[in-house]
């Protein structure tokens, strides 16, 4: 019946002076409950955690799946449907009536996520407007997301499996690609390959950016055809076991130009310097600045233009981030990307991205694909 994440949740709630927690972010709900294969993007689910009970409020479409997933857990499923705010207000009144709590304002603190929509917050206010017992709403800052930043072994195993698919897809796509293909043709083959290899879905919409398009870090694949001398940036990932992978490789069509080789070497050096230095206690800001320093030393100061990396998990972008703004020390169990890049508008772009986990004495890289410049 144990749920270690639920126990951690309650410990953190107590430490922050929060009695109940109203959780609507679907990735947070998935993480807290540890239910697999149940939740989708529908806004049909609420996890409501109190000091002694934990509920999932959903509707009839998810009743059977939630019932199966909750067996041998402490979660109570209520698939009655309806508005989450009204349901919580009713439960709240029943709890405090049974406990003999004196009627009044702010009888306890109810944590709400900083990502909750204003519309739903107004619904909560209305639901409690005439109630005999009213909570004090306590807005939190990444309350569950910060807990999600430290991964357990089951999560790490899922991400290693997702990355194995991604590595295999890269091995295939470099054999498939040829001069004259469009970016969209390469993208379709890449994504179909990940699915054929066992991906449950894509971690995100894949990037295939050739030639000058590669200078836009989030370029959208189009009808541009691969040309001799092009650098081609490919950023892609699979989803397996409910978790994401993320990698980027930049390859060259035909013989690489001297500039392409110079850029690639600088980006590779930055990537490998950071991966060698990551360990507990070092900050995301320090890792970002290290990459910037390596690029600057190679003549590409100010040519990255984005943060060095981000957390990965249920979502493709999680905490912690490797950015100049993050002075929080890294912890064992943090999973992050390392993705330095150089972008020269009108010419080329290059990015090299791995991801892995912070360990007791360093950084375990999940990505196994080569760091050598691959020639198509």
PLM ranges: what are they?
Residues 1-376:
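Active-site neighborhoods and metal-handling regions in enzymes and metal-associated proteins
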């Amino acid at each position: 019946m144990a749920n270690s994440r639920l126990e951690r949740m309650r410990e953190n709630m107590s430490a922050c002076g929060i009695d109940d927690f109203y959780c609507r972010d679907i990735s947070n709900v998935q993480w807290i409950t540890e239910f697999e294969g149940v939740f989708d993007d529908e806004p049909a689910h609420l996890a409501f955690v109190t000091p002694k009970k934990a509920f999932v409020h959903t509707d009839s479409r998810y009743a059977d799946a939630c019932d199966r997933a909750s067996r041998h857990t402490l979660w109570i499923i209520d698939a009655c449907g309806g508005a989450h705010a009204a349901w919580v207000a009713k439960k709240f009144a029943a709890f405090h009536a049974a406990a003999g709590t004196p009627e009044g304002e702010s009888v306890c603190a109810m944590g709400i996520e900083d990502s909750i929509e204003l519309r739903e917050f107004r619904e909560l206010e209305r639901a409690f407007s005439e109630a005999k017992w009213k909570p004090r709403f306590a807005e939190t800052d990444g309350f569950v997301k910060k807990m999600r930043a430290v991964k357990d072994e089951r999560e790490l195993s899922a991400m290693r499996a997702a990355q194995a698919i991604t590595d295999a897809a890269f091995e295939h796509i470099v054999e498939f690609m040829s001069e004259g293909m469009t970016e969209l043709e390469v993208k379709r083959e890449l994504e179909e390959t990940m699915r054929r290899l066992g991906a449950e879905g894509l971690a995100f919409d894949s990037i295939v950016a050739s030639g000058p398009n590669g200078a836009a870090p989030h370029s959208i694949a189009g009808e541009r055809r691969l040309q001799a001398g092009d650098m081609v940036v490919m950023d892609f990932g699979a989803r397996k076991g409910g978790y994401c992978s993320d990698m980027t490789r930049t390859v060259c069509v035909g013989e690489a130009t001297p500039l392409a080789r110079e850029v690639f070497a600088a980006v590779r050096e930055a990537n490998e310097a950071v991966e060698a230095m990551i360990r507990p206690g070092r900050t995301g800001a320090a890792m970002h600045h290290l990459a910037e320093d390596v690029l600057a030393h190679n003549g590409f100061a100010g040519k990255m233009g984005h943060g060095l990396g981000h957390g990965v998990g249920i979502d493709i972008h999680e905490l912690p981030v490797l950015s100049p703004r993050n002075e929080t020390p890294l912890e064992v169990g943090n999973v992050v990307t390392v993705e330095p890049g150089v972008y020269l508008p009108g010419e080329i772009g290059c990015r090299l991205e791995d991801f892995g986990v912070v360990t007791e004495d360093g950084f375990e890289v999940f990505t196994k694909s080569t760091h050598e410049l691959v020639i198509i």
